[in-house]
Amino acid sequence: MSFDVLTFGRVSIDLYSKNIGAEFNDIKELTTSIGGSPTNIAVGAKRLGLKTGLFSAVGPDPTGGFILNTLKNEGVDIVHVQTIKDTTSTAVICGIIPPDRFPLIFYRDNAPDEKITIDHVEKIDFSIYKSFLMSGTALAVEPARSAALYATEKAKKVAIPVILDIDFRAISWKDIRTHGIVLRQYLTQCNIVIGTEEELLSVFIEDANQLSIKENAITNPTITGNVNEAIAKVMDFGVDLLLVKTGADGMVAYHKDGTVEKVPGFKVEPVNILGAGDSFAAGFLYGYINGWDTYKSCRLANACGAWMVTKQGCCNFAPYYNEIIEFIESKGGF
């Protein structure tokens, strides 16, 4: 059996506030889902119509069972989702306070995905995948970092594209400067890179004072620096395509030959920005794997991101193909 993409990184149970606008202390109800950037991408791409697999890990606990069962129900291949003893499955609690406050609390002590090893990678036949998508957070600690590097090496040996979603989460890095050091080395192995302007700046952080996170907005940090310089430096690493997400404005695609494409977004009333970037990546993957041109692929990506910001959750609200095409047509088409 062949697959369109294998995503690598974290998986969690996500608990979303059902009380829109409530402060964390006042949350009365939570709804359950699964999450983690590579998980959201795998589920989102599967709903659109791709065959997807997840390379991650859970603990030997009921939470891990919930995660595995949910992935099965979504049709994501879990052959390479490990159950690692003496670990505890990850949990995330998410507040939703529109228009711009979305606090996150991560519970990742002894996280299973951080214990993934080279031995786990040895069991993967990369020749059955059309692409390999890496979460930047999976590079944060050993032994998962070495596993990620080896997985990338194996992917390149069978000549499938390596796609990096920078997925910057400052909380995952003990020294924020390490993030830049590791990512700059990894970028030399990438064909396609996906990130926000802030995530591009994160690759070149030299001082912790460049970073600030307010009200636990882990997914939306403020980082000082020159975005245009960061874009140029990323392209200098030799990537074929850089996709820069610019929120409501859409995105900008930078090609290796110097071509720049601005792809407009879709106007919606935002409820929750969490997961929008992952939905974007899923949409792009669908177009890319199916041979669409960059503009159309990114237009679909923007639509998926816009769809997600109107929802009260992450991948449990990811659109199916017919839904997102209807959405695009209602907004004037591709």
Stretches with model-predicted labels:
Residues 46, 72, 153-157, 187, ...:
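Anion (oxyanion) recognition and catalysis
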Residues 131, 137-229, 249-251:
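Conserved beta-alpha-beta core of the PfkB/ribokinase-like small-molecule kinase fold
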Residues 1-6, 153, 205-334:
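Conserved phosphate-binding/catalytic region of the ribokinase-like
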Residues 125-127, 184-187, 236:
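A short, aliphatic-rich alpha-helical micro-motif
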Residues 1-77, 93, 100, 116, ...:
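Glycine-rich phosphate/adenosyl-contacting loop at the front of the ribokinase-like
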Residues 51-134, 325-334:
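Conserved N-terminal subdomain of the carbohydrate kinase-like
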Residues 45, 196, 277:
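Short, conserved phosphate/pyrophosphate- and ester-handling motifs at nucleotide-, phospho-/glycolipid
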